[in-house]
C-alpha cells in the first residue's frame, strides 16, 4: 500500500461519519495485539487549550530526553502532523505500512460479522502501532470528542489525566449542559492516575474533583493567578510560576497563561512520580514550543495572525488578546465558520473589533456556513464586509487594504484570520508563499 492509497482508504472510511463508543476500537486493537497496553500516556481532554497544553508538555518531555509521542486532532498544516514523535511527523511510508495492517485487521473483523471501525478509530490504532514500534517512553494523547466514549479512552490508566479549560461545545453530542459535558470529559479519569486541571468554573471543578476522589486519584488545580508576568506581547510571554522562574513561551494570547500553568503542573506531577525533568529542560522546552493556529504570527509587515477560536469561550479570550495587543491598530479580519458552531455568538464577540471583514467558505463544503450567509450575519456588527469567492482572494484583499495607505499605516494595521482551525493551514501557505 502506498501513502496515496492509504489516504484514499481512510477518506472512504470518513464518509461513514463517527460513532461514540469503545466496543469497535476494542475489537480493532485486539486484532492488532493491543499495542496501547505497552505504552504510557498523558491523556488530555478539554474544550479550549488542550492542544497548547499538549504542545508544551510534549516539547518539554522531548527536551528532557524522553521519546515522546503526540496524537492530535484536528491538524492545521498536514494530515500527517496528527502522529508525531519528538516533534517529527510520521513518515509517509510508515503511515502506509501501518494503515495496511489496520486495513487487514478491519477485514478480519468484518468477516467475523463485527461492526466496522470509524476513521478516527483507525487513525488512533495507527498511532498506537507507530508509538509502540518506535518504543516511545511517553505518549501525550489528545482526546477527540468528549472523554468517556472517545476512542482514545480505550487506554488503561494514564500516568496523568489533564484537563484544559472546559466550556460549552458539541452541545447535544457529548452533553446538553456544561455539567454534562464536564462529566463526559471526566471519563478519562481512571483509578491509579494523577489528575491535573486548568482553573475551571466552580461547577466543572467540583465534577472533576469529585470524580478524582471517587477513583482514588490525587487532584491538582493549576493556579495561574500565582503566575508573575514580566513581559506579555504578541511575541510571547515571559513569566515565573512557582519554582519555574523567568521562563519564556513564544506562544502569545490571553489563554496561554492558563495553558502554561496547566502544562507546568503536569510536569510537576510527573516529577513527583519519579520522572526527572529539570528546570533547565523546562525552560528550553517552553522556548522551543510551537503550535500553529493558536494566535500565530505569519507576517510582520503587515502584521498577520491566525487563530482557531471557534466557540464562545475561545472567542472571548481572543477578544481580550486583540484588545490588549492591538488597541490602537486598524483591525482587518478574515473569517470562516462551520454552520454547526456558535457562529452567532462568535461574530457578536469578535466582529465589533474590526474595521473590515472578509468572509470565506471553509474547505469542508458539508459543514461550512457559506461566505455569503456569514457576511449577512457579520453585517450586524461591522459595516464593511465582503464575501469572498476563495480563501486566497480574501488574503489578497486583506493584505491590499492593509498596505494601501503606505508603509507607516501598514505597521499599525493587523490582519487576523479566525473562526475555525480548518482553513488556517491554507491561509498560512498563501501568506508564506507571498513572502518568498
Regions found by a protein language model. Give the residues of each.
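Glycine/aspartate-rich loop-and-adjacent alpha/beta segment that forms the canonical ThDP
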Residues: 420-436
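Beta-strand->loop->alpha-helix junctions that form or flank phosphate-binding loops
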Residues: 72, 198-199, 211-232, 250-254, ...
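Acidic, Mg2+-coordinating active-site environments of NTP-dependent enzymes
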Residues: 109-112, 134-142, 158-246, 260, ...
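ATP-dependent carboxylate-amine ligase catalytic core
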Residues: 29, 34-37, 63-156
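Short functional linear segments
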Residues: 1-46, 52-66, 70-71, 107-115
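Hydrophobic alpha-helical packing residues
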Residues: 57-62, 131, 350, 378
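Nucleotide phosphate-binding/pyrophosphate-handling subdomain across enzymes
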Residues: 133, 138-141, 149-162, 166-170, ...
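C-terminal helical cap/extension that packs against the catalytic core
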Residues: 201-220, 303-306, 312, 347-413
Amino acid at each position: 500500500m502506498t501513502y496515496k492509497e492509504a489516504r484514499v482508504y481512510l477518506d472512504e472510511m470518513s464518509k461513514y461519519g463517527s460513532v461514540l463508543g469503545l466496543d469497535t476500537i476494542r475489537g480493532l486493537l485486539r486484532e492488532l495485539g493491543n499495542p496501547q497496553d505497552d505504552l504510557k500516556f498523558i491523556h488530555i481532554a478539554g474544550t479550549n487549550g488542550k492542544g497548547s497544553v499538549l504542545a508544551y508538555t510534549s516539547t518539554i518531555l522531548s527536551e528532557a530526553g524522553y521519546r515522546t509521542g503526540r496524537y492530535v486532532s484536528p491538524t492545521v498544516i498536514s494530515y500527517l502532523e496528527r502522529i508525531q514523535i519528538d516533534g517529527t511527523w510520521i513518515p509517509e511510508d510508515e503511515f502506509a505500512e501501518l494503515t495496511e495492517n489496520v486495513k487487514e485487521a478491519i477485514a478480519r473483523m468484518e468477516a467475523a460479522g463485527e461492526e466496522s471501525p470509524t476513521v478516527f478509530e483507525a487513525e488512533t490504532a495507527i498511532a498506537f502501532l507507530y508509538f509502540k514500534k518506535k518504543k516511545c517512553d511517553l505518549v501525550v494523547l489528545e482526546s477527540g470528542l468528549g472523554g468517556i466514549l472517545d476512542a482514545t479512552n480505550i487506554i488503561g490508566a494514564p500516568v496523568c489525566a489533564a484537563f484544559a479549560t472546559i466550556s460549552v461545545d458539541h452541545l447535544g453530542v457529548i452533553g446538553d449542559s456544561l455539567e454534562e459535558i464536564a462529566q463526559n470529559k471526566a471519563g478519562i479519569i481512571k483509578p491509579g492516575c494523577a489528575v491535573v486541571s486548568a482553573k475551571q468554573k466552580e461547577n466543572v471543578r467540583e465534577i472533576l474533583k469529585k470524580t478524582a476522589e471517587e477513583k482514588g486519584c490525587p487532584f491538582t488545580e493549576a493556579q495561574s493567578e500565582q503566575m508573575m508576568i514580566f513581559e506579555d506581547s504578541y511575541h510571547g510571554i515571559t513569566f515565573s510560576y512557582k519554582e519555574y522562574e523567568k521562563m519564556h513561551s513564544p506562544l502569545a494570547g490571553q489563554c496561554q497563561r492558563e495553558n502554561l500553568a496547566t502544562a507546568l503542573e503536569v510536569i510537576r506531577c510527573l516529577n513527583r512520580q519519579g520522572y526527572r525533568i529539570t528546570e533547565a529542560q523546562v525552560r528550553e522546552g517552553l522556548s522551543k514550543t510551537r503550535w500553529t493556529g493558536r494566535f500565530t504570527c505569519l507576517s510582520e509587515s503587515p502584521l498577520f495572525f491566525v487563530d482557531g477560536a471557534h466557540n464562545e469561550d475561545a472567542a472571548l479570550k481572543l477578544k481580550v488578546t486583540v484588545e490588549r495587543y492591538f488597541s490602537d491598530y486598524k483591525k482587518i479580519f478574515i473569517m470562516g465558520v462551520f454552520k454547526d458552531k456558535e457562529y452567532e455568538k462568535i461574530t457578536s464577540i469578535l466582529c465589533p473589533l474590526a474595521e473590515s471583514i472578509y468572509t470565506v467558505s471553509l474547505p469542508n463544503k458539508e459543514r461550512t456556513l457559506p461566505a455569503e450567509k456569514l457576511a449577512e450575519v457579520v453585517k450586524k456588527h461591522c459595516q464593511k464586509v465582503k464575501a469572498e469567492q476563495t480563501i486566497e482572494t480574501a488574503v489578497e484583499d486583506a493584505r491590499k487594504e492593509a498596505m494601501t495607505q503606505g508603509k507607516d499605516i501598514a505597521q499599525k494595521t493587523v490582519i487576523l484570520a479566525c473562526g475555525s482551525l480548518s482553513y488556517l493551514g491554507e491561509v498560512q501557505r498563501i501568506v508564506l508563499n507571498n513572502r518568498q
